[in-house]
Amino acid sequence: MAVTSKVSTFLTKVSQGVRPNMFQVDINFPEGDLGDADKELASFMCNSANLPSSNVGVIEVPFRGRSVKIAGDRTFDNWSATFINDKDMRTRSYFEKWLNEINSHENNTAGLINPSEYGRTVVVRQLEKDDSAGGDELRAYKLWYAFPTSASAIDLAYDSNDQIEEFTIEFQYSYWTVGDTEAPAGRSGIAIP
């Protein structure tokens, strides 16, 4: 069987590819004493993120001088997102309040005690670049019971000209799910609230 290696064949198969700069992050912030988070602002200020990863452990079972490998438990790595600091520092302030409600700085107390209170959903959406598709969602990952565990420092310096401050929030979460992969034309077809 002949192998085709034409550029035209490659371009037909790859089309435009998926662009890493076409994404959206939606964070379902806790409600209540934290005040009203501007969810839309946080979504716009998210400058970088990643599609979450997972790992399946391996159980090695000795058998007659060899190790037989059996699939183990699934684990989920930390997830982080970087945000541009808005003029009023509202996004940064809200994450700091969220962290403080999980465990306060001064009193070592928690305003949000139950995981269902401080653990929220985060949705990472991979979007379509093709304008004719209207920026449709290609795939969406929903992180369940996510909560921030750290807010990075923001470096300040006199020589930091022509820059906007950024900070990174690291999250822990229980697991992630992805939309329906059986949808037509490669679209996820999911509607995640």
Locate each region found by the language model.
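Glycine-rich, low-complexity intrinsically disordered segments
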Residues: M1-P193
